[in-house]
Structures are given as structure tokens and as C-alpha cells.
Swiss-Prot record:
Recorded name of the encoding gene: LRRD1
One GO cellular component term noted in the UniProt record for this chain: cytoplasm
Protein name (record): Leucine-rich repeat and death domain-containing protein 1
PROSITE patterns in alphabetical order: DEATH_DOMAIN, LRR
Ranges of Low complexity composition bias in the record: 90-103
Length: 860
């Protein structure tokens, strides 16, 4: 997660209530259905944290309350809301007298069963549970849940089928490829079966035996066909086949008279059968990301349908029959090919959410005034030049997103949308923000980035509920004073404008948490910023700032400070007073050294000093034991030639980027950085990798492309954590360049292992050549060159032991000593050849050269 995303998450906490209210009224998911069905109402309970028995289907539908312009800063919570299609089932049944509190009271009893079935060895030893054992475990007439998610199961645990009282069975995220062998008496009470993410290729015909099944989830598998026997599941209410390989819509589903929710999103459907209207109870239908080229008319005759998702298809028009969807509340058709909207769509008087982003719409009809219940309208990424004034009749509208169109102005009467909370008009041709926007008393999020706006009306100060404002990349000359009067404003971005001065009024915005002013015309770090004692994130990058005021010490909450691409020539010591600072970016300045006071930044985690003018590596950085990420690459700055051994003091370092320098070697103690996960050292002059590099057991990314490496260490395959490697653009001989091109560690490791074996054999042959051909005089000279003492080579029976044997024994001793230095067989060979050359053993050299030529000609 980036720092911006982290701050956005803080802001999302503030507006979570708004989102929750908006979503609960928008009818986007089955949980928002305001009907009497317990099944549907439970999903709504889930969103409020009430439901106790749920399973989830993951899918990539977009969050309807987030503009595409802010997608880069969505919080994790929003990502989950984008992906989840909730489905739930009530644990209270007609005729069941047990209350929820009673069930909770018996948790300890049935937890024994869950623990027993969830044992680590369950994949190897199937549990045998007799009726007597079931009683001992407390299995009675209760609604028991068995959760075996991610237990490494290779096959369906058949013995579970014999347990009478299991009602909810979760087997997600295993490796169950199929399940068969059920008998007519098995799992008679099973109501929920979830087999997501297992690699299932099909469903067995025995599925029909699960007569009481109400929810079946087999999403994220490899299923290409739905068996006809599924039509026998008369009690089924929810079916989830999301993200499979289904090409034909299962016609047998028409027999499922109680089906309420059907998810077939992300399959390969091209056609919907005309028999679909037989599903008269269907309320929620997901067909997103299929291959539909037309809007299936059969969908228009589902009388109870309230939510329809056709996102990501190839639909170019809507049929007139769409008017028959009288109860439809949510229609999602983002990422299609729509060029116009059939006028009949405006007869859907109950519509509450309409998403049409990323189409080719040029006009919206004035009949939009019919949508009196509309809460959410998403029209991003179309070709709209104007929005009809009649949109002001959509009095319930809460979210209006119009980004990435061709709008020059807002609708005249937009101020009548009293319930509007989000207005996003990014990347259009807006020249100004109309004064009447000040009447939007409930507005919380306002985004106008990427337009040609020159100023912001002072009247915006009346919008006292605004939390977030985006005005980046416009033509604003002066900091908008009206923004300084917004007491609820937490997030403000005015990047990419022409602001040169900061007014004193900003010092009153003490509630600000996140402020972005990069790419403006600021010459100084204004002291008015220093009054923002709650500010956590400040981006002043790409300005012309040269120094920092001493009063910055007042910014006690500051966690992230971006000062890249400014005019700093010396490191601002004033920054060292920011005890809570976690992220500092001073890249692309003119820094030559760093103050030793930087050690006062006790909580610093991320530093970016790339593209500066350091003469040497700033050794002061090595004091920062809390540092996790360091970037000192110099693509634009002065090149570093060496790294200090003290680098190993940064014991918490996880990411190190030393790329684009002139570094010749990696410190020999690099292995002491035990937490290192990512090492980027590309485009340097490194010719050798120290053995301690192989001690980095957590290393996942290693980029050494563009260096002078001729060989890789044989034991590199021992770094089991490595996931990404890059040795491109090195003069590699061992292994050859073509072996490394695929960036596959297994391939490289296999080559090196075989090369090691080959080098050992060659070295032994060289030993024999030397031993069989060396003279007594040359042998003595060779021992001297190899630093072998006479005591190591003299033998008590020298007169009876041949010169050949003594020479071979000496070479073995030399090899044993050299192995302590972690020298490879190839390195030993090269040393021996140099020594033979120095003593003038040319005849032996000729024989070794012939051997080398012969072995290179043989592929292994």
C-alpha cells in the first residue's frame, strides 16, 4: 500500500457511516432487498455486522461510491466491498424453537467436532464419527457448522457425509478436484455447501441427493458444465458459479422454483435461453464479465428481479422490453458498448442505482426526471457533453459521478440535489465551479481534478460537511480561501496548479490530515503549514523549496513528508525534530551529505534519497535501525562507487535500491541484513556476488541486471524464498545468458548444479594431468605458488612414493584448504592454471588447454 492509500484509509473511516447508509439504500446487493424474505434480509444484517452464518463470493465489481479517478487510493475496505457478493442463510427455521443465545451457549459442545474435523492431518486420515461419538460431541438437532477451509484436502472428506447434523459445510481453498460416492442417506440436513477455489472440473450427479440444500457455492473453479441433476434441488435458493468456464446457460435451472440469487459472472456465456422467465422468484442475477453481445430479452420478464449485473459484456443497446422490469432497483452495465439508452429504461421507477461507466453514451434523456428513487448514478468514461437539467428532479440522489467525459459545466439546477453527498467531475472541460454548489449542504466528497478551473468560489465555505476535495491539475493561481473555512475538511489535493503563496488562513485548518500541493510554484516551506498539528501527510514535491523553517517541529503528527524535486542543496536538519516521521522523500534534489542528526528520526521506516549529488554513500543512514526501505538509486544524480560495511547495521531493512550507480561490489557482510526482501542493484559494475548473499533467507526479489557478472554462485538455489530474479545484460558464462533469459530460478539452479558436477570432474582430470606430467623441480615451485608448506607435502616414505602420487596428494590438500574459503571448482581451476603459467609448465598447460576445448565442445 502506498502512503497516499494509507492516508485515504484514515479518511474512509470518517465517511464509513455515509457509505454504509448509501449502500443500505442503494439496493446494490441482495442484502439491500427490502422484502420480507429472511434469506434476503440476512444479507443486510451482514453489512451491519449481525449475521453469524455467511459465506462470500469474490468478484471484481467496482465500488459504486468510488469515482474511477480515485481508484488509486481506495482503501482495503473498499476493495473488499468491490469484490464481495454476499450470500447468507438464516439459522432460524420454522418449527425450530432454539434461539440464537441457546445456540451460542452450546458453542463448546459442537466446537469439539469442528476441532476434530479441522485437525492438521484431516487430509491424510478421514475422521470416523459414530453415532455414539456424535452424541458425546454434543451433536443434537442444532445447526452445526463444519469449516475445513484451506486444510490442504485432496479429496472430499466422505466420512463427513455420514454425520447427520451438519448443516453448514465449508470446504473452500482446498485441492478437491471432484466429489462422488454420496448415498441417499448422506448429509440429509445439509443446507449450505461451499467449495470455492478448489479446482473442481465438474459436479457429480449425486448432487441431487442433497434435497435440503439451500445454498451452493462453487465459484472460482474450473467447471464447464452444470449437470441436469441440479434441477432436483427443489429447495435451493442461492447458486454461485462465479468465475468458472461455463459456456452454455444451464436450461435445467428453470425447474428451480425457489431460486432467489444466481451468480454466473465471469464465465463464457454468449446466450441466455428464452426459458429464463420460469425463475419467477429470482431477485438477484449476476452475469458480469461474460460474452453477451445483446441484452437478453428473457431477462426483462423476471417479475421479482431487483438487482441485475451485466458489467463487462459487449452489449450495445437496450431492448424496449426493459420497461417490464418493474421492480428493478439496481442495474449495473459498466464496461459495455452502449451508444444510447432506450427511452423505455426511464420507466423503471424503482431504480435506485444505475452504473453505466465506460460506455459510449453521448446523451442522457431529460426523462431521467422519472428516477425519483435514484441514489447512485455513475456515468464515468462516456462521451457526454452535458447533463440534462431535469436531473435536479432526482431528489434522492446521493452519489453522482461524471468523470472522464466532455462536460463544460454542471446542470443549472444541481443545487436542488439536497441529498447529494458525492460529486465527482474529474477530467472534463470544466472552466469553473458554479456558485450554486454552496447550496449542497450534505456534500461530503467533491472532485474536480483534471479540468481548466482557475478559481474556487468563496461560497464553498458553506459546505460544512465536506471531508474530501480533489482539485489537482487545474489552472488555479491562488490558494482558495474558502477551503480554509471548512471545519470538516480532512483531505485536500491541489497538485499541479500554479499556487505560489500559502495564505495565513490555512493555519486555522487544524483538522486537516492529508494535504497535497506538489507541482505548484512554491518558493518556500510556509510557516503556516507548521500550525497544522494534526497533519499526517504532506506532499510538497516538485516545487522550488530550498529550506525548512524551525517551526516544523510543531507538526507533531506528521508521518509522511514528500519533498522530492525541489532545490535543497543541504540536508535540512530541521527535519530531524520530527520524531513521528515514518516516510521521507528527498529524491531529485542536490544533496551532497546528510546530517548526523538524522539519527533522531527514531521511527523512520522509508527513505528516498535517489538522484542526489552524494560524493560517498551517506554513512549516517546506517544509524537508522528502524529503517525498512532505502532508495539511493542515482539515475539522475552522482554515481556512488562503493557501499560501506556498516550497511549491515540497518537490521530492519526490507527493501534496498542501489540501482543506477557505479558500485563495483556488494559488501561481504550483506548477509547480515536478515530481513531483506527486495534487493535492486541493476545498472552497476558488480562483477562478484559475496557468499553471504546466500544467507538472505527472506529475499524474494533480486535484480542484478546490467552489471559485469560472469558467473552466479552455485548455491543460489538455496534461497528458497526467491520469487523474482533478473540477471539480464550481464556477460554471463556460468550459466550462459540464454539460460537466464527466462528469469526462472529452477532452470538456473539446475544448470549450476550440473555445472558444479562437471567442474569437479574436470578439476580431477586436471589434477591427474598435473600429477602425471610435472617434474620434481616444477612440483616444488608449484607448492610455493599454492602456499603449500613442505610439512604438508613431504611424506615419510618419500623414496618409495612416486612423484605422481605426491603431486596428486598435494593438490588434494590444496583443494581442501581452499574449500574453507568457499571457492568453487571453477575458481580453483583458474588459480591452478595461473600458478602453472607462472612456473613455466607449458607442456602441462597445453594438455589442460586441450582438455578445456574438448569439454566445451560437449553439451551436458
Amino acid at each position: 500500500m502506498s502512503e497516499k492509500e494509507g492516508m485515504s484509509e484514515v479518511l474512509e473511516d470518517t465517511i464509513s457511516q455515509f457509505r454504509k447508509e448509501s449502500r443500505s439504500q442503494s439496493m446494490k446487493e441482495p442484502g439491500f432487498i427490502k422484502e420480507t424474505s429472511n434469506l434476503i434480509n440476512e444479507a443486510s444484517d451482514y453489512l451491519e455486522g449481525k449475521s453469524s452464518n455467511q459465506i462470500y463470493e469474490t468478484h471484481p465489481r467496482q465500488n459504486t461510491l468510488e469515482s474511477t479517478s480515485s481508484s488509486g487510493r481506495k482503501s482495503k475496505r473498499n476493495e473488499e466491498q468491490k469484490k464481495n457478493l454476499q450470500f447468507s442463510e438464516t439459522s432460524t427455521r420454522t418449527g425450530t424453537s432454539q434461539s440464537l443465545s441457546s445456540l451460542t451457549g452450546r458453542t463448546a459442545e459442537y466446537q469439539a467436532l469442528v476441532n476434530f474435523l479441522s485437525h492438521e492431518t484431516v487430509g491424510e486420515v478421514s475422521p470416523q464419527v459414530s453415532e455414539e461419538n456424535q452424541k458425546q460431541l454434543g451433536l443434537g438437532a442444532d445447526n452445526f457448522t463444519v469449516n475445513l477451509e484451506a486444510k490442504g484436502l485432496q479429496e472430499f472428506p466422505k466420512d463427513i457425509l455420514k454425520i447427520k447434523y451438519v448443516k453448514y459445510l465449508y470446504l473452500d481453498k482446498n485441492q478437491i478436484k471432484t466429489f462422488q460416492g454420496a448415498d441417499s442417506g448422506d448429509l440429509l440436513g445439509l443446507e449450505i455447501l461451499s467449495l470455492q477455489e478448489n479446482g473442481l472440473s465438474s459436479l457429480p450427479s449425486e448432487i441431487q441427493l442433497l434435497h435440503n440444500l439451500r445454498i451452493l457455492n462453487v465459484s472460482h473453479n474450473h467447471i464447464s458444465h452444470i449437470p441436469k441433476e441440479i434441477s432436483q434441488l427443489g429447495n435451493i435458493r442461492q447458486l454461485f458459479f462465479y468465475n468458472n468456464y461455463i459456456e452454455n446457460f444451464p436450461s435445467d435451472l428453470e425447474c428451480l422454483g425457489n431460486l432467489e440469487i444466481l451468480s454466473l459472472g465471469k464465465n463464457k456465456l454468449r446466450h441466455i435461453p428464452d426459458t429464463l422467465p420460469s425463475l419467477k422468484t429470482l431477485r438477484v442475477l449476476n452475469l458480469e464479465y461474460n460474452q453477451l453481445t445483446t441484452f437478453p430479452k428473457a431477462l426483462c420478464f423476471l417479475p421479482k428481479l431487483i438487482s441485475l449485473d451485466l458489467t463487462g459484456n459487449l452489449i450495445s443497446s437496450l431492448p424496449k422490453e426493459i420497461r417490464e422490469l418493474k421492480n428493478l432497483e439496481t442495474l449495473l452495465m459498466d464496461h459495455n458498448k452502449l451508444t444510447f439508452l432506450a427511452v423505455e429504461i426511464f420507466q423503471l421507477l424503482k431504480i435506485k442505482e444505475l452504473q453505466l461507466a465506460d460506455n459510449k453514451l453521448e446523451v442522457i434523456s431529460h426523462k431521467i426526471e422519472n428516477f425519483r428513487e435514484l441514489r447512485i448514478l455513475i456515468l464515468d468514461k462516456n462521451l457526454l457533453k452535458n447533463i440534462p437539467e431535469k436531473i435536479s428532479c432526482c431528489a434522492m440522489l446521493e452519489c453522482l459521478s461524471l468523470s472522464d467525459n466532455k462536460l463544460t459545466e454542471l446542470p443549472k439546477y444541481i443545487h436542488k440535489l439536497n441529498n447529494l453527498r458525492k460529486l465527482h467531475v474529474n477530467r472534463n472541460n470544466m472552466v469553473k465551479i458554479t456558485d450554486c454548489i454552496s447550496h449542497l449542504n450534505n456534500i461530503c466528497s467533491l472532485e474536480f481534478s483534471g479540468n481548466i478551473i482557475t478559481d474556487v468560489p468563496i461560497e464553498i465555505k458553506n459546505c460544512q460537511k465536506i471531508i474530501k476535495i480533489e482539485l489537482s491539475y487545474n489552472k488555479i493561481m491562488y490558494f482558495p480561501l474558502g477551503l480554509c473555512a471548512l471545519d470538516s475538511l480532512y483531505y485536500l489535493s491541489v497538485n499541479g496548479n500554479y499556487i505560489s503563496e500559502i495564505p495565513v488562513d490555512i493555519s486555522f485548518s487544524k483538522q486537516l490530515l492529508h494535504l497535497e500541493l506538489s507541482e505548484n510554484k512554491l518558493l518556500i516551506f510556509s510557516e503556516h503549514f507548521c500550525s497544522l498539528i494534526n497533519l499526517k501527510y504532506l506532499d510538497l514535491g516538485k516545487n522550488q523549496i530550498k529550506k525548512i523553517p524551525a517551526s516544523i517541529s510543531n507538526m507533531i503528527s506528521l508521518h509522511v513528508l514528500i519533498l522530492c524535486c525541489n532545490k535543497f542543496e543541504t540536508f535540512p536538519r530541521e527535519l530531524c525534530t520530527l520524531e513521528n516521521l515514518q516516510v521521507l522523500d528527498l529524491s531529485e534534489n542536490q544533496l551532497q551529505k546528510i546530517s548526523s542528526d538524522i539519527c533522531n528520526l527514531k521511527g523512520i521506516q522509508k527513505l528516498n534519497f535517489s538522484s542526489n549529488q552524494f560524493i560517498h554513500f551517506p554513512i549516517e543512514l546506517c544509524q537508522l535501525q528502524s529503517l525498512e526501505q532505502l532508495n539511493i538509486s542515482q539515475i539522475k544524480g552522482r554515481k556512488l562507487t562503493r557501499l560501506p560495511g556498516e550497511l549491515s547495521n540497518m537490521t530492519q531493512l526490507k527493501e534496498l535500491d542501489i540501482s543506477n550507480n557505479a558500485i563495483r561490489e556488494i559488501p561481504r557482510n550483506i548477509g547480515e541484513l536478515r530481513n531483506l526482501v527486495s534487493l535492486h542493484a541493476y545498472n552497476n559494475q558488480i562483477s562478484y556476488l559475496p557468499p553471504s548473499l546466500l544467507s538472505l533467507n527472506d529475499l524474494q526479489q533480486l535484480n542484478l541486471s546490467g552489471n559485469n557478472l560472469t558467473a552466479l554462485p552455485s548455491a543460489i538455489y538455496n534461497i528458497f524464498s526467491l520469487k523474482e530474479i533478473n540477471f539480464d545484460d550481464n556477460p554471463l558464462l556460468r550459466p550462459p545468458v540464454e539460460i537466464c533469459k527466462g528469469k526462472q530460478l529452477y532452470t538456473i539452479a539446475r544448470y549450476l548444479q550440473r555445472a558444479d558436477e562437471r567442474d569437479e570432474k574436470i578439476l580431477e582430470k586436471i589434477f591427474k594431468i598435473v600429477a602425471n606430467n610435472i617434474t620434481e623441480t616444477n612440483f616444488e615451485f608449484l607448492c610455493q605458488k599454492l602456499n603449500l608448506a613442505n610439512s604438508e607435502t613431504d611424506m615419510p616414505t618419500k623414496s618409495t612414493v612416486s612423484l605422481s602420487e605426491r603431486a596428486h596428494q598435494a593438490l588434494v590438500i590444496w583443494k581442501t584448504q581452499s574449500n574453507k574459503l568457499s571457492l568453487t571448482a571453477a575458481a580453483l581451476r583458474d588459480q591452478l592454471i595461473r600458478a602453472l603459467t607462472m612456473i613455466g609448465a607449458y607442456e602441462i598447460m597445453d594438455k589442460i588447454t586441450a582438455l578445456n576445448l574438448f569439454t566445451r565442445a560437449i553439451k551436458f
